Amino acid sequence: MQKEKIIQELEELKNDNRFRTIKTNDKSLYNFSSNDYLGLAHDKDLLQKFYQNYNFDNYKLSSFSSRLIDGSYLTVMRLEKKVEEIYGKPCLVFNSGFDANSSVIETFFDKKSLIITDRLNHASIYEGCINSRAKILRYKHLDVSALEKLLKKYSEDYDDILVVTETVYSMDGDCSDIKKICDLKDEYNFNLMVDEAHSYGVYGYGIAYNEKLVDKIDFLVIPLGKAGASVGAYVICDEVYKNYLINKSKKFIYSTALPPVNNLWNLFILENLVNFQDRIEKFQELVTFSLSMLKKLNLKTKSTTHIISIIIGDNLNTVNLSNNLKELGYLAYAIKEPTVPKDTARLRISLTADMKKEDIEKFFKTLKAEMKKIGVI
């Protein structure tokens, strides 16, 4: 490792407006960048109910060891059992969505395997693909026909094929048709992995659950750091796969388990999810209103969900736009390469259930005015 080379690389990132820094958010800003979609993490009444329900003297702030040593306490076992009751398949809790996604792929697939992945899948999925040393093929984003062409071409050449998709995509705010992908399993022999990071909670137990597709999905991954208002992830799969992960997944075996209090909160949210239906319906009204407002203002987006992507293109213009909005009281982060493809830098705007229509309307009108000022519309 050459320090001079690292310094040069960091300078290049700065010159290209791609240098990342860690900042403390100003809580006075109106937040259009939060992934707390249902507003659960900031619901004081909900938190109070949680605190009143349990004697926290019994719940430690660390598990002190991995699940295979002394970290598999009663709370996490109850949580996994509850997930199994709801989804009809065994569950294994991982420390994060990143660990869950990468672990599934790198544990079950190897250099003899073929992995076919949506081009815009999350970095955690690509991490697993690379670590597995499998052959990797990417299909055009959301294009099930392109996926089928690859399956038709390669299905005879590989005994071990994995197809990976997300439900809601976090940078474009669009959705995959997992029903169509599941239907391909009737004709082609492959394993299917689905990541529901940005749909769990927003759509109740998730899109796969709502469309009764859990049985057709070999690995259903549900990260909890978005609408789940927490940390960790569920991997929902057959018992034999769960046992294999317990015995072979390095990230599971060698990681200190999540603290009991975190999984107690995960269990509390899971058990109360059925009570959030009014909140979910109100949230979907906000989504419909926002997309309608964008159309009315002639602001273009490919988004169809609660994540609204406004593509600017140029890094500097996107950063300047984000900074200008911050000066006006809005937090809307600029997303740049390599998180998104080159020349597609954007504002990623996320809605939350505790927003008001009048505030959303005011924000989008302000956004349009600022876009005009810097000459991007």
Describe the role of every protein-language-model region.
Residues Q2-L61, F190:
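N-terminal "arm"/small-domain region of PLP-dependent enzymes with the aminotransferase-like
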Residues L40, E281-T288, K295-G329, L351-A353:
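Conserved PLP-binding catalytic core of the aspartate aminotransferase-like
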Residues L40-K44, Q48, Q52, K81, ...:
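PLP-dependent enzyme catalytic core of the Aspartate aminotransferase-like
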Residues Y54-G97, V287:
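Conserved N-terminal alpha-helix of the aminotransferase class I/II PLP-enzyme fold
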Residues V104-A123, E148:
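Conserved PLP-anchoring active-site segment centered on the Schiff-base-forming lysine
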Residues L137, H141-V194:
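Active-site phosphate-binding strand-loop segment of PLP-dependent enzymes
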Residues L213-Y244:
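Active-site PLP attachment segment
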Residues A257-F276, K282, K295:
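Structural motif of enzymes handling amino- and sulfur-group chemistry
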